[in-house]
């Protein structure tokens, strides 16, 4: 009988830790530290454990992609083995529970010293390798012990100044120094937490370049401040915060190792974790390639994205903050948010990974895009992008149990007040005589592509209408007419038809959606279908959509 201890690691309070600041450099450093805490630092902690106990350990390296590499802990050769790090968790095996506790102490100490603000949660459980399922033990730990420990954890109360002290501008904790001057940002008071985040920015940037840039794109840099995200001088400038998350990936991780032997479970989880991580990286690489290909040099030697706006000092108007795996957050120029989110979802679908039955299956995902003014509070924008992503996921679940990629967005031309549901109830719900129920001005969320004949709320349909408004002779350069149409749509079908007739719009119809169930022309002539307006979203997005692939 071979007994081992399973350890599962997780972190809590990550969102406020990463996104609580309105300074991009602090967000960048925070994201890097979180990724290190339960991955590379866990491997390093195993190395330190080895030195303390003078026994061999094995820290599986996914970069080498050898999921069955020896030595194995069940062969009595190891004191500890890293099973996998992925899906938000890190799982390890120890030959003795004391080693598991010792390892956790080593890792916890480093996090306290180098990443104050990250809360590590660890649970341990002994199990019999020969008679128990490792898969089941890990599932029980995650569903029961880990959740219970998170709920019962007493939130830490940081010790504030005991005398006359200055406070950090970002965290309101006791300041320990001043930040270094960076670009136009003057030095400011910082706490130790912010100090560590800023110290990590260089390493975060280097890692991002190594993972995502190739020989074509390596001349470009990732921006460290939002003002370098493509901001146009003299214009109102916007930044887009995009959060994307795979559909049902938690369940996919749960089911993947089911009904396998313990060693086969370890191999399977390593393969799945590696393939999901690589899928996300590959999708982001393609996003960058398409963005780089869209940058053109004009007659004055200025580099512009599709001729629309200039990029400064070779800074790409795009920056991933959380990446690797199916859970991704990136920021970009506000005019690129919708397009880059759609490209990312499309490219992610092209990266099939093995399913529980061993057959390749594409990753479907949803994305939420929140476009706000450049210096709008970042934490709030991220929170809304998460809400929008959840909205898109609910849309997928409501559609007859089909699995597809979808996206939802909000374009905040001014401020934001309330949740997404409150904003839409207040600004996008109208009572018009054509429908008994309250009608919806927005067609969002939309599916990435047409899945069946009746689908019309699709990315292709939406972008076709936006481009028509921007380029067709009936509408191009006639912004007042478009704005007038937007207000008329609020009044319903009859008012819309009168508008089309009075303005002598060709065929007395709005831009056609791709044909669906024979209703495309009907929608174009009325502007509404089944209580949903097909054109309000497109009009709103005219200044926030640039096609990069045409």
Where in the sequence are the language-model features?
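Regulatory and interdomain segments flanking nucleotide-handling catalytic cores
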Residues: 1-550
């Amino acid at each position: 009988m071979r007994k081992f201890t399973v350890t599962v690691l997780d972190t809590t309070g990550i969102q406020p830790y990463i996104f609580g600041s309105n300074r991009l450099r602090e967000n960048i450093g925070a994201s890097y530290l979180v990724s290190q805490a339960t991955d590379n630092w866990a491997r390093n902690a195993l190395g330190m454990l080895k030195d303390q106990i003078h026994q061999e350990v094995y820290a599986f390296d996914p970069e080498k992609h050898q999921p069955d590499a020896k030595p194995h802990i069940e062969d009595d050769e190891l004191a500890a083995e890293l099973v996998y790090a992925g899906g938000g968790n890190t799982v390890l095996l120890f030959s003795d529970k004391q080693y598991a506790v010792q390892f956790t102490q080593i890792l916890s100490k480093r996090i306290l010293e180098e990443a104050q603000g990250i809360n590590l949660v660890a649970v341990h459980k002994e199990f019999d390798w020969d008679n128990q399922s490792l898969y089941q033990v890990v599932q029980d730990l995650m569903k029961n012990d880990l959740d219970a420990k998170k709920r019962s954890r007493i939130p830490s109360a940081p010790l504030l100044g005991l005398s006359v002290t200055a406070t950090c501008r970002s965290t309101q904790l006791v300041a320990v120094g001043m930040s270094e001057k960076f670009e136009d940002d003057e030095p400011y008071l910082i706490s130790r937490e912010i100090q560590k985040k800023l110290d990590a920015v260089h390493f975060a940037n280097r890692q991002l370049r190594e993972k995502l840039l190739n020989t074509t794109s390596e001349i470009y840099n990732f921006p460290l401040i939002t003002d370098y995200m493509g901001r146009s001088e003299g214009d109102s400038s916007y930044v887009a915060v995009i959060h994307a998350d795979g559909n049902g990936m938690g369940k996919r991780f749960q089911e993947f190792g089911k009904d396998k032997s313990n060693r086969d479970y370890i191999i399977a989880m390593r393969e799945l974790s590696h393939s999901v991580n690589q899928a996300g990286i590959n999708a982001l690489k393609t996003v960058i390639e398409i963005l780089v290909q869209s940058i053109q040099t004009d007659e004055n030697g200025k580099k512009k994205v599709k001729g629309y706006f200039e990029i400064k000092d070779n800074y790409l108007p795009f920056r991933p903050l959380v990446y690797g795996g199916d859970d991704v957050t990136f920021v970009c120029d506000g005019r690129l948010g919708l397009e880059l989110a759609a490209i990312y979802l499309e490219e992610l679908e092209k990266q099939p990974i093995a399913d529980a039955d061993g057959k390749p299956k594409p990753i479907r995902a949803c994305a939420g895009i929140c476009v706000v003014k450049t210096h709008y509070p970042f934490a709030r924008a991220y929170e809304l992008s998460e809400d929008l992503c959840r909205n898109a996921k609910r849309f997928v679940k409501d559609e007859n149990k089909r699995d597809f990629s979808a996206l939802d967005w909000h374009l905040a031309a001014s401020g934001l007040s309330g949740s997404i549901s409150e904003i839409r109830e207040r600004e996008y719900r109208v009572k018009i005589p054509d429908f008994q129920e309250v009608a919806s001005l927005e067609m969002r969320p939309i599916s990435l592509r047409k899945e069946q004949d009746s689908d019309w709320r699709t990315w292709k349909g939406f972008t076709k209408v936006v481009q028509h408004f921007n380029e067709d002779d009936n509408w191009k350069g006639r912004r007042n007419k478009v704005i007038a149409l937007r207000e008329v749509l609020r009044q319903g079908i009859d008012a819309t038809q009168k508008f089309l007739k009075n303005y002598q719009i060709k065929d007395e119809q709005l831009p056609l959606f791709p044909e669906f169930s024979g209703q495309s022309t009907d929608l174009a002539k009325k502007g509404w279908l089944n209580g949903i307006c097909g054109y309000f979203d497109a009009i709103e997005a005219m200044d926030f959509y640039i096609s990069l692939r045409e």
